[in-house]
Regions:
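Membrane interface segments of multi-pass transport proteins and intramembrane proteases
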Residues: 41-47, 77-94, 173-183, 202-213, ...
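Polar-ligand-bearing catalytic/cofactor-coordination segments
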Residues: 93-157, 203-207, 213-243
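Small-residue-enriched core segments of transmembrane alpha-helices in multipass membrane transport
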Residues: 89-103, 182-199
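Juxtamembrane "helix exit" motif at the C-terminal ends of alpha-helical transmembrane segments
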Residues: 33-41, 61-85, 162-184, 190-193, ...
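Amphipathic alpha-helical transducer elements in NTP-driven molecular machines
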Residues: 14, 18, 22-25, 158, ...
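A transmembrane-helix-recognition feature enriched in membrane-embedded lipid enzymes
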Residues: 16-38, 202, 206-225
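Hydrophobic alpha-helical transmembrane segments of multipass membrane transporters and ion channels
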Residues: 56, 60-72, 98, 102, ...
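Large intracellular
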Residues: 1-59, 88-92, 98, 102-145
């Protein structure tokens, strides 16, 4: 059990847009540490990965993710631009669709891995437990089990929001040379991530609105590919973790 970092207790966490970057960076580091801890427990290793090794793991993961989901679609769209005679808006839109396809294929592919299947089951337990907690019911496996696997603030849905917002932002940039196009994709990632966080936060606070529920539907639909039905012991773990 760890105390929240000082940033969570500062005024910075209340500033719109800035809070998104703080929370997401902290969640990335915490998530990496927990995945490493889980892997060590399964293999029986007690060696901790922290400090430079932890930040190095996060750094390499970010570089690979940016390369696959941002740079590669831009290169493919740039190649198509030489074949298809059209305007920059259409090319940027095609690039966004390629990025969306990459995301869906990635989520589908990792879901087929046995190790990730168990991870997704714990993810489902997490969602069910949070749904139960927000419904103000007693947190027990029996009470948690009937709740849905999907949750409007899921990280998978967040990735979808990032992709959709990137389509809009990049389409507004207009025509750019390939090098500048690639640089713009990389440099604007923090802006897109912050906008995505604020959008998700806003929709989560307005779910009683039927229009907002329609906007959230694609997020929930994509989660059909990630959370899995958890076992009772997984629900027990998730309920104890939240308590």
């Amino acid at each position: 059990k760890e105390e929240l970092t000082g940033l969570y207790k500062s005024r910075l966490i209340k500033i719109p847009f800035l809070r998104g970057m703080i929370i997401l960076l902290d969640a990335l580091l915490l998530g990496t540490r927990l995945l490493v801890l889980s892997a060590n427990q399964q293999t029986g290793e007690e060696e901790k990965i922290e400090g430079p090794a932890l930040y190095g793991t996060v750094g390499v993961s970010l570089v690979i993710g940016i390369g696959i989901f941002f740079v590669l679609p831009t290169l493919i769209a740039g190649g198509l631009e030489k074949i298809i005679e059209t305007n920059s808006f259409v090319i940027n839109f095609i690039e966004g669709i390629i990025r969306l396809i990459f995301l869906m294929v990635y989520v589908w592919a990792i879901g087929k891995m046995p190790e990730i299947h168990r991870f997704f089951a714990y993810h489902g337990a997490e969602h069910k437990t949070i749904n139960a907690y927000e419904a103000q019911v007693e947190l027990s496996p029996e009470n948690i089990s009937p709740f849905p696997l999907e949750h409007p603030r899921c990280g998978t849905g967040f990735l979808l929001i990032v992709v959709v917002i990137s389509i809009v932002v990049f389409a507004l940039l207009g025509p750019l040379d390939l090098i500048w196009r690639i640089l713009s994709r990389i440099l604007l990632i923090p802006v897109i991530v912050i906008l995505a966080y604020e959008y998700m936060r806003w929709t989560a606070n307005h779910l009683s609105n039927p229009i907002v529920r329609m906007l959230v539907f694609p997020n929930l639909w994509l989660q059909k590919m990630t959370p899995r039905e958890p076992s009772p012991d997984m629900l027990e773990v998730s309920s104890m973790a939240l308590k």
